[in-house]
Amino acid sequence: MESLGTVTILGHGCQWIDLNPCARYIIAMSLRLIRIIIVLMGALLVAGGAYTVYWYNAAAELRAGIDRWAQDRRAAGWTVDLGDPDITGFPTRLEAFFQTPQISGPDSWWRWVAPNIRATAAPWLPGEIAVSAPGVHVVTRRSGDVWAELDKAEADIVIENAAMKNIVARLAGVRIRLPGGEMLVAESAVMRLLGSVPATPSIDVGAYTPHPDPSDMGFGVALDVRKIVLPDQWRPVLGRNIGKIALDAVIVGEIAPAASLKHTLTRWRDGGGTVEVAALALYWDVLRLRTSGTFALDGKLQPEGAMVADIRGIEAAMDRLLAAGVINSRAAFAARIISRALSFGGGSARLPLSVQEQRLFIGPAPVLRIKPIRWN
């Protein structure tokens, strides 16, 4: 005999078990679970709606920031054509796409025509931006056009307090055509620009690095370029192939943009500007150089400075320079004597180098006249 909610168990006697409490418990737990699910779904809908509003506000602020930057540059005399950037990437990123932007400096003394540029940031970290711009970049100056074809062009930019704090650029497959038609090629290049930093090394090139004054602060520049091929038209004495150029330096002194590069450098020099080279490495055929030192500009805006260098292969390099007529026999002889006197067991030599009045000195001996730099 059965009835709703009861079970009859047959045995030595009849027992009646009422299942109504179990059913009520199961129903109560099911309702509680349904309520939890409804609350969670409501919370997710509210959070999703709030995040959607946040993302679109961030996208609007990004577009407004781009417009403000362009307007500020135009007010300073620049010509800026960014087109109508596309802002996409919802929901996981903010992505700005610029189609072939063009920018010209004041008085049109330079002009940059870029390929398509894509900039991406996480909505919750808008100050950390990843930029990609492979393709052909054209920089036009009064001396002519420079074409740079880049198989890979990426950069990571960190912005803090409306100012650029850190930029790391990575290039690969670099082919540069200069105004005279010369081709300069590099397998890869990495460049880092830092904001206010002390004049201390951030890369190790194996060179002796003096301890700088802790008060020396400036604009940090680090560069590492590999497998460079120089233009044949230059007829480089040590060969066209450079294995490596690595630089870690701090530019000390205020750099205030002026009407031209020459005027900008003049202001920087007059304000006591210097370049503290914490580390420099050059691997060029037979020559291996690792050095550090301090440089500035003289009254004619030509480099001058002093450094201590570890050099390997200086005698072979002097022989090539002598054979090419770049230096005379007296300078080559002086370089050999100084190198042998200061070398370590016939290996590398630690030599004092200086640049003054467009001449390179090894110790007190002038060995090479340097062509003047035309900043205009």
Annotate each language-model stretch with its function.
Residues 75-208, 280:
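N-terminal beta-strand/beta-hairpin edge segment
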Residues 102-110, 137-148, 173-188, 227-240, ...:
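Flexible, membrane-facing loop/turn or short amphipathic-helix motifs
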Residues 183-282:
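Acidic, serine/threonine- and glycine-rich low-complexity intrinsically disordered segments
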Residues 30-67:
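N-terminal type II signal-anchor transmembrane helix
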Residues 25-41, 83, 264-270, 274, ...:
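Extended terminal
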